[in-house]
Amino acid sequence: PIGGITTQGVAFGANVNTRAILDMTAQFDFYHGGGLDVCYLSFAEVDQHGNVNVHKFNGKIMGTGGFIDISATSRKIVFCGTLTAGGLKTEVGEGSLRITQEGRVTKFVESLPEITFSGKVALERGLDVRYITERAVFTLKEDGLHLIEVAPGVDIERDVCSKMAFRPIIDENLKTMDPCLFTDAVMGFK
C-alpha cells in the first residue's frame, strides 16, 4: 500500500485510507524502474568499506527479501539500526541519550563474511549512503566510513569507536544531533 495507516492487532496487515494498492510484481517493477529517490533499510552488519550484510549472520541464512531490488535502484540509501545488538538498553531524556546497558554483539565489523550491499559499487554509482544508529550517523566516502554526527550525551571514544571493530574517520565538521530528538515532548514540526 502507498499512504494510509496500517492497522494493529488482529487486523495487522490491513490498511485504512491508502492512496494506492499495488500487487508485488507492480511494486518491484516500480523499484526496478528507478522509482525510488531514497530508501530506508535496516542492517545486520556493516564493515569499514560500507558493505552491508543482511542475509547471513549468527550462522543462519535469513535471505534478502526485496533488499537488493530496493537498494540497487535508489539514488540515496539510508541504513538504520543500532550500533550494537544483544541486550542494548538506552534511555532518552533531557535532550540526551544514555546507554544503560551495552549490546553484546558488535555490528560494525572489520570485514563481512557475506555482502548484500556493496559500498564500492555505491561509490562508483555516485550514491549518497548513510548509516544511522541511535548514537551516531556515518556517511560513506571513498576513504571509508565517516562519523558525521553523534547524539548528545555520547562520548565518541567510549560509546562509538570502542564499540566498532574498526576506527571510523571522524569528520572535521562533526555535528551533534538535535537535542529535541532526545526529549519526551512534541518536536514542533510545522
Which stretches of residues belong to each language-model region?
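Glycine-rich phosphate/diphosphate-binding loop of Rossmann-like nucleotide-binding domains
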Residues: 1-3
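Conserved phosphate- and dinucleotide-binding cores of soluble alpha/beta proteins
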Residues: 5-186
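Short, low-order "capping/linker" segments at domain edges
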Residues: 188-190
